[in-house]
């Protein structure tokens, strides 16, 4: 559970902020950017230890997330609006079910 609720947000945030675009975003970012990147400010040695101590669960969550990202990427790359809408609606529905 910790891999999903705590460790993954830190990994995603940290990976996201490494985009070359991050250095040129000023004036274009708002709440979504701030929400996603807040936890990138972290204690690297502590988090590395936590990721490795929970290695199997963290890898499971990472693999699941990568698979999901690839589905979005494939839909965008193939200009498949219907699939993209389905993916987005599924995500919204999951959020409503989980956090209603």
What are these regions (language model features)?
Residues 13:
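Acidic/glycine-rich phosphate/pyrophosphate-binding loops and surrounding catalytic core
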Residues 5-9, 40:
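Active-site oxyanion/phosphate-handling segment shared across diverse enzymes
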Residues 24-94:
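Interdomain hinge/lid region at the active-site interface
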Residues 1-6, 23-26:
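Conserved Rossmann-fold dehydrogenase catalytic segment
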Residues 97-100:
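Amphipathic alpha-helical coiled-coil segments
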């Amino acid at each position: 559970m910790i891999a999903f609720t705590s460790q993954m947000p830190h990994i995603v945030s940290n990976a996201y902020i490494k985009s070359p675009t991050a250095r040129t975003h000023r004036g274009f970012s708002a709440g979504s950017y701030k929400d996603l990147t807040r936890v990138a400010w972290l204690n690297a040695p502590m988090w590395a230890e936590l990721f490795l101590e929970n290695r199997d669960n963290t890898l499971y969550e990472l693999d699941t997330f990568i698979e999901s990202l690839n589905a979005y990427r494939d839909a965008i790359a193939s200009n498949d609006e219907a699939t993209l809408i389905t993916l987005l609606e599924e995500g919204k529905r999951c959020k409503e079910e989980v956090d209603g």
